[in-house]
Amino acid sequence: MFNSYDDYVAFLATLLDRFVYIQTMEFKVYLTSVTEGYSEGTMRFSHELVLSFNEHIDFAAKRLFKYGYVAYQRGVKLFYYDPQPHPNDPSLASNFPHHKHIHPDLKHHRIPAPEMTFENSNLETVIREIETMILSM
């Protein structure tokens, strides 16, 4: 994980060069306290795919404590990841609280997301998922 604000900003800045299907990327990173930060941004891919993201980072603990990743195509929400707890949904227990919202019924159709973690940024994982979608189009 990232030791500092500067490490995290440097990581975000390299994504555009490391993933060929990202056409443009905009992001902002804010320090919310001496040891915590918040990022928000948008990546645009080919095939009119867009990824909006936010990550809340505790630099002292070297981990995320909240995140959100939302994929769109032509303005239509395709899927999203969040760690909002749903303790009464036993189907999500295997990777609590990490899960993915998918169609049909995007808001209520949730599946476990074992690839998500608080131990590091999940952006590379979601970018690879979008790249796989692009390759299958």
Language-model features: locations:
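An exposed acidic His-Trp-rich patch
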Residues: 65-116
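UBC/E2-like fold recognition across ubiquitin and ubiquitin-like conjugation systems
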Residues: 1-50, 104, 108-137
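Intrinsic disorder/low-complexity signal
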Residues: 54, 81, 128-130
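Amphipathic, interaction-prone secondary-structure segments
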Residues: 34-75
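Detector for Asparagine
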Residues: 3, 54, 88, 95, ...
